[in-house]
Amino acid sequence: MSADGIKLLRTPGFDKSKWMQLPRDVVIGHNALDQFPAVCQDLKIGRSVMLFAGKSTMQVAGNRIEELLAPSFDISTFLARELTPESMKEGEEAACGVDLIIGVGGGRVIDTAKIVSFNLDLPFISVPTAASHDGIASGRASLQTSEGSASLTAHPPLGVVADTGIIAAAPHRLLAAGCADIISNYTAILDWELSNRLRGEPISEYAITLSRMTAEILMKNAPMIRPHQEESAWMVVKALVSSGVAMAIAGSSRPASGGEHKFSHALERLAPGKALHGEACGIGTIIMMYLHGGDWRGIRTALQQIGAPTTPAELGIPDEVAVAALMMAKTIRPERFSILDSGLTEESATALIRLLYGE
């Protein structure tokens, strides 16, 4: 069929363009690690591979990956101990000259692999051993600095291989935190839409729709999330990957990060080591949903069904620290508008924390 005569529709003054980077191969399920050689073959990478792992995650999954890839690849290992600028430099020096980086572990290890691969312009494959947050498939990474956690731009993984047997065997607290991180998409979207209306910030309807749908599906299935069940791990990992894709479409973490994430980062600074990222986001989501006039009780019920904390006391955090975190939250990433920027007094913040304990 000839293309002669076909007229291209060109809108006067239209100059938009969009570059999206998405994971290419995603394998989720029972014994997914066994498909690793096929994934590497499909991605057509070189022969030199470096595994980034922790001591425990090397035993959980890293050794098995080495065994599977050894016949066809030259494999080396870097133990990622801390998520700091110093460890990033060590990782970059170790990985210089390899063809592929594989991050095997939780958020710390995967973020290390993600940042190093981005800085060296190398592809990387994400192999989560727990489903505690949506960074397993996103193009964002967190780095610990002297001033707290900093959010960095990186590339999303070229592939994701998530073995539900391994993830289901991890402590349920990690899975529940991952669920809470997904549920927080609800208020992240509301903040983004509010910023669009009040500040004219551009939004992506596609990213918003995908992010909201992901949270809705998990909320609907909250009663089915059970400890150490592969079906539960399957459901949560799919949601985490979907959330990461929404961020890739948006070109930022906006579809999954709003005032509730600001609260989480503030709480991390004021009470370090007390709460997992997703746990704090879940509590923040209850508060932000109340401020938005939404179904905050429904959010709280879903978190309780999953087994995620809904009050600071459950995390061993004094209420006054949570109040201080709420007051500090708007100073975190001040360029990112959220409902917290509408004006929150300390008296109101105290009442919001008390609200968490109510009927």
UniProtKB/Swiss-Prot annotation:
Cofactor note: Binds 1 zinc ion per subunit.
Pathway named in the protein's UniProt entry: Membrane lipid metabolism; glycerophospholipid metabolism
Keywords on record: Cytoplasm, Lipid biosynthesis, Lipid metabolism, Metal-binding, NAD, NADP, Oxidoreductase, Phospholipid biosynthesis, Phospholipid metabolism, Zinc
Record-listed NAD(+) binding positions: 107-111, 129-132, 138
Any one GO molecular function term: metal ion binding
Taxonomy, superkingdom: Archaea
Compartment annotation: Cytoplasm
GO cellular component, one term: cytoplasm
InterPro entries: G1P_dehydrogenase_arc, G1PDH, Glycerol_DH
EC number, UniProt record: 1.1.1.261
Annotated positions binding Zn(2+): 181, 261, 277
Catalysed conversion reaction: sn-glycerol 1-phosphate + NAD(+) = dihydroxyacetone phosphate + NADH + H(+); sn-glycerol 1-phosphate + NADP(+) = dihydroxyacetone phosphate + NADPH + H(+)
Catalytic EC class: oxidoreductase
NCBIfam families assigned: PRK00843.1
Functional note: Catalyzes the NAD(P)H-dependent reduction of dihydroxyacetonephosphate (DHAP or glycerone phosphate) to glycerol 1-phosphate (G1P). The G1P thus generated is used as the glycerophosphate backbone of phospholipids in the cellular membranes of Archaea.
Descriptive protein name: Glycerol-1-phosphate dehydrogenase [NAD(P)+]
Protein's organism: Methanosphaerula palustris (strain ATCC BAA-1556 / DSM 19958 / E1-9c)
